[in-house]
From Swiss-Prot:
Residues that bind ATP: 10-17
GO molecular function, one term: dTMP kinase activity
Enzyme class per UniProt: transferase
Biological process, per Gene Ontology: dTDP biosynthetic process; dTTP biosynthetic process; dUDP biosynthetic process
EC number: 2.7.4.9
Transmembrane segments: none
Protein name: Thymidylate kinase
Length: 210
């Protein structure tokens, strides 16, 4: 069996983490070895970078600094966790990956997509997700859910225009490559979202066999 790299993407409050756990349980019930991870993070070093990226601070972080920190964490994550798991034939379920960089640093911060692509090639080589699930919902619903969780991180404190750009970028990327992306209506009740994931399970198992 070959490894399979599945990423879960979407804006704040989309339920990626909850649904990642659900999807992992469904795959494990079929006897599949699953590794759960997240970005930024996934290793001790990358988690420390995550803290820098998410912690509110009196010192403004430049968009370029943010971008480079994201890819520094990703390089460590790939070397230490993702590539070895794929080599072992496992299914990797990752909460965010490079699509988030295009959405947040590209769309939200307004950085050049070409600049991001150069770093993507440098850090990842030819590694891309086999499948990306984009959990989509209206910005106001996502921000309301994020606020209900408690203290907001540095990204969650951004304004409506930032998240409009994030959502728009995700949708543009999904439309441009329908073979890799699946849109999930994350505004639905959780049971309905998970029912839609159930319909994807045969596709995931077929991808793994392929």
């Amino acid at each position: 069996m070959t490894g399979l790299f599945i990423t879960l993407e979407g804006p704040e409050g989309a339920g990626k983490s909850t649904n990642r756990e659900y999807l992992a349980a469904q795959l494990r019930a079929q006897g599949v070895q699953v590794l759960l991870t997240r970005e930024p993070g996934g290793t001790p070093l990358a988690e420390r970078i995550r803290e820098l990226l998410l912690a509110p601070s009196d010192e403004a972080m430049s968009a370029d600094t943010e971008l480079l920190l994201v890819f520094a964490a990703r390089a460590q994550h790939l070397a230490e966790v993702i590539r070895p798991a794929l080599a072992r034939g496992e299914v990797v379920l990752c909460d965010r990956f490079t699509d988030a960089t295009y959405a947040y640093q590209g769309g939200g911060r307004g950085l050049s997509q070409q600049r991001i692509a150069v770093l993507e090639e440098f850090v990842q080589g030819d590694l891309r997700p086999d499948l990306t699930l984009v959990f989509d919902l209206p910005v106001e619903i996502g921000l309301s859910r994020a606020a209900a969780r408690g203290r907001l991180d540095r990204f969650e404190q951004e304004g409506r225009a930032f998240f409009d750009a994030v959502r728009s970028t995700y949708l543009q990327r999904a439309k441009a490559d329908p073979a890799r992306y699946r849109l999930v209506d994350a505004a639905q009740p959780l049971a309905d979202v998970q029912a839609s994931l159930d319909t994807l399970l045969p596709q995931l198992l077929e991808l793994r066999r392929g």
